[in-house]
A protein has these predicted regions:
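ACP-dependent fatty acid/polyketide chain-elongation machinery
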Residues: 1-67, 89, 245-255, 352-366, ...
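Conserved catalytic cysteine-centered active-site region
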Residues: 1-3, 37-80, 100, 110-173, ...
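Conserved small-residue
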Residues: 10, 28, 82, 103, ...
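Short, well-ordered amphipathic alpha-helical segments that serve as non-catalytic structural scaffolds
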Residues: 78-89, 143, 170, 242-244, ...
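Short glycine/threonine-rich loop-to-helix capping motif typified by GTGT followed
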Residues: 268-277, 306-323, 342-349
């Protein structure tokens, strides 16, 4: 593999905190919660009735109305975030570069809302009521496909699908595509609209989600003694990645370098984290080796931090295992305390927050952390953002099936 370095030049996000980077980042640094009562279906019969919904989003702002009808909501979010990231990068796509620009954008559960809607039409009226756009509107790889159709990019175009590690793997493999020489620019990340009735119902049946329905803003509380499960969130997080010399040649503004990527498997349990965080620890170690950085270099770690009793402790143990004594000197926070858990889009949003931490010198807080739970004894940047200039940031994403993904970003 040639020594092709990869940098981040564009960021785009749709989240429960806002429908662009400025509003979302403002919410993050000010410790605002985007969690509220579920509003787009009647959740009265569900154990969990709260989520981080995307609000005041109009897909027609990003795609023609006639085309928007052919896309599930997760595609709307992903297309919008992709177009924002392209604009933020100042990237002009033309016949001269289109074949060298690709998209690797995934989703954890994809078009589940569309599947529900079309199933209802079938049950009410039979097969003739099923939309001819049902399949292409719900399959996950149609998201990068729509980005290609809208922008004209002709490079590698596909999706990673690995539950809540989807975006970490998408971004990491997009970096590899550039390093391998298969592309000069990749649009990468994930999108999700998971707050649908069957999705919420499924997670409720697993007893995986918080039931703090009377206080939604305080429901997502990673590492806190009173944490009782995660809170679903919707949205998309997309990065524009470029080969360093290509970015320099076109005069691009460079946020930072994407220096390392790790991917491992627990081989332990369908949904529970591995004991003592063994799998995630190997993943972090792999990413650091790839970036050629020592544990002592990690200044900030955007954790997976879902607010589940088992998961938060396991990740704390994994961080200690991977970073050794330096774990206690590393600022660790979970922005899921504010956004909720965006599932397949989580790693994209959190990669953006990691990049912004390097770029702005502001470390995102973990809100709702009033009293750390047993064994949770790291510096979780509780409740208030912190001014701190760091050179290296790490971002974790772990998913059902025991799949892990870690990214390492470095200031240039």
């Amino acid at each position: 593999m040639s020594n092709r370095r990869v940098v981040v030049t564009g960021l785009g996000i749709v989240s429960p905190l806002g429908n662009d980077l400025a509003s979302t980042w403002d919410g993050i640094v000010n410790g605002r919660s985007g969690i509220g009562p579920i509003s787009h279906f009647d959740a009265g019969a569900f154990a969990t009735r709260i989520a981080g919904e995307v609000r005041d989003f109009n897909p027609a702002d990003w795609v023609p109305a006639k085309d928007a009808k052919k896309m599930d909501s997760f595609i709307h979010y992903g297309v919008a975030a992709s177009l924002m990231a392209i604009a933020d990068a100042g990237l002009v796509i033309d016949d001269g570069n289109a074949e060298r620009i690709g998209a690797l954008i995934g989703s954890g559960i994809g078009g589940i809302l569309g599947i529900e809607e079309q199933t209802e039409k079938y049950l009410q009226g039979g097969p003739r009521k099923i939309s001819p756009f049902y399949v292409p509107s719900t399959i996950i790889n149609m998201l990068p496909g729509q980005v290609s159709l809208l922008t004209g990019i002709k490079g590698p175009n596909f999706s990673a699908v690995s539950a809540c590690a989807t975006s970490n793997h998408s971004i990491g493999m997009a970096m590899r595509m550039i390093q391998y020489g298969d592309a000069d620019v990749m649009i990468a990340g994930g999108a999700e609209r998971g707050s649908s009735p069957t999705s919420v119902g499924g997670f409720c049946s697993m007893k995986a989600m918080s039931t703090r329905n009377d206080d939604p803003a305080a429901a997502s509380r990673p590492w806190d003694r009173e944490r009782d499960g995660f809170v679903l969130g919707d949205g998309a997080g997309i990065l524009v990645l470029e080969e360093l010399e290509y970015a320099k040649a076109r005069g691009a503004r460079i946020y930072c370098e994407l220096a390392g990527f790790g991917a491992t498997s627990d081989a332990y349990h369908m949904t529970a984290p591995s004991e003592n965080g063994e799998g995630p620890a190997r993943c972090m170690a792999m990413a650091m080796r790839d970036a050629k950085v020592e544990p002592e270099a990690i200044g900030y770690l955007n954790a997976h931090g879902t607010s589940t009793p088992l998961g938060d402790l396991a990740e704390t143990l994994a961080i200690k295992r991977a970073l050794g004594d330096h774990a206690y000197k590393t600022m660790v926070s979970s922005t899921k305390s504010m956004t909720g858990h965006l599932l397949g889009a989580a790693g994209g949003a959190e990669a953006i927050f990691s990049v912004m931490a390097l770029h702005t010198g502001i470390i995102p807080p973990t809100i709702n952390l009033d009293e750390p739970g047993e064994g949770c004894d790291l510096d979780y940047v509780p409740n208030v953002a912190r001014q701190a200039q760091v050179d290296v940031a790490m971002s974790n994403g772990f998913g059902f099936g025991g799949t892990n993904g870690t990214l390492v970003f470095r200031r240039l």
